[in-house]
Amino acid sequence: MIKIAYNQHLYNHPLPEGHRFPMIKYDLIPEQLLHTGDISREQLFEPEDEPEEVFLRVHEPSYLGRLKKGEVSAREERRFGFPWSQRLLEREVNICSGTLQCGLYALEYGAALNVAGGTHHAFPDRGEGFCILNDIAVGARYMLDEGYVNSVLCVDLDVHQGNGTAFIFEGDDHFYNFSMHGRSNFPFKKEQNDMDVALPDNYAEEAYLKDLAFFLEESFNAARPDMIFFQSGVDILECDKLGKLNVSPKGIKARDEMVIKKASRLGLPLVAVMGGGYSENIAKIVDAHCNTFKTVMSYY
């Protein structure tokens, strides 16, 4: 049974009216999948918070300590993009724990998904871009440290480069990070990944999919992975207000299928996290995210 991390009490965190982050999607995704019968309630699990030691494998003790004490400056709040509260920290810890536990479920069932996650802009000592703790890094680091796998490939197809993940795993031969992102988009100071494909604004869908097919194959061959982490951000949608690319819902579906089909055919456990999506039309964001779940179900 494919397991899905979701906490109905924490994932949809209250934000000030008019905030541009579409937090409501974290409730709408499971609601829609349940309504259409694509998943069952038995597949959903509420993550149990992992101990602090797990987070210290990725994040600096001083940073975690300040977060726990609520010692967050106004400048840090602006970098996070969220108003600070202890409830927000509880949310971030729970999401990271969910991604780690998805890794364990993926080993058992072939694949697992987190309704949230993909917080790839979080660094060891700081957060930015709606990311405070790095769930991909926490999950992958645990899988590697505990000997569950020897090599992880992260396929990061969010329109924004996962700069935090790149920094955390720089020089780590057991973690291969492939990022295909917008060249002119946030973050404006890029980090160095194992494979970076930086796309110009308004890049055509046909060219996008052609490039992805080529560089995905290159990444799998270079990484020779035992596990895949898929950052499946849907902010590459043509209607996304932050994305600057021209990929249709059909194109995103083809993208997801390319990644998931490849991992499945190689018999590799896969963890999918949702990443970004900032269209004015929330239904388009939710539909695109839901398709990722459906595609995983069809191949695993």
Residue ranges and their predicted role:
Residues 1-137:
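Metal-dependent C-N hydrolase catalytic cores
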Residues 74-300:
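A general "terminal functional-core" signal
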